[in-house]
Amino acid sequence: MVAIVVPVYTDLLSEKDIISLKRLNRVMSHYPIVFVKPESLSPNLFRELCPTSVFENFPDNMFAGKKAYNNLMMSEQFYERFLGYKYILIYQTDCYIFRDELMSWCEKGYDYVGAPWIKRDVYDRPFIRTYMKISRYLTRLFNKPDRQELFNRVGNGGLSLRNVRRHYDFIREYPLVVKRFTEAKQYHLYNEDVFWSIEVNKHNINPFIYPDHITALSFSFD
């Protein structure tokens, strides 16, 4: 039903990366653990840290920086590899998992779950609120992305549960929407998690289902 997918681009791991992967192996090794990596990267260290893991290789250029990674996570070929599962849990190596509640989250029927981007209280101060209204007007006028759309939305892709078929089908059905993001200049509002959290339901006649931001805090926090 679900696999844990760990994207990696190097085996020069920090101490925190190693702690993260050891914890993953300790708590979650009864699930399939799949490392997504460049073709040229040796699997040896990852196999040592997570002995039951398997590997999916992609061309090296798909890991050549943040932009390339974002494009990989919006690509048909990525989700196609995991169509044998209903869900994948993306687990980047800066995550730390406290306990296993994965199956209970899979059973809730959401299409995407990640740590919510909580709106900070400072944005409700009168001066800041006025500034944000002007900013929103200008972004709409010039058809630019608006960071205010992220407030209390779900959420961060670093630890995220994704319905594989829903993601795969959207990419196939709306290639021009995907292309607008993949061809945009590197900017955080064009990141893949913004795409899956916000952009898809601007176009999708069959909307993605997300938890509200309070519920999502029980899944993960950033």
Where would I find each of the regions flagged by the language model?
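Membrane-proximal basic amphipathic "stem/tether" segments
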Residues: 1, 123-149
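N-proximal low-complexity "stem/linker" segments adjacent to membrane-targeting elements
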Residues: 1-22
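Short, charged/polar "capping" segments at the starts of alpha-helices
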Residues: 12-16, 39-46, 102
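Short, acidic, metal-binding catalytic loop of nucleotide-sugar glycosyltransferases
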Residues: 20-31
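Active-site-proximal specificity loops/subdomain of glycosyltransferases
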Residues: 36-86
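Short beta-strand-to-loop acidic/aromatic patch adjacent to the donor-nucleotide binding site
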Residues: 85-97
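Conserved donor-nucleotide/metal-binding helix-loop-beta segment in metal-dependent transferases, i.e.
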Residues: 96-134
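Catalytic core and acceptor-binding pocket of nucleotide-sugar-dependent glycosyltransferases
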Residues: 141-222
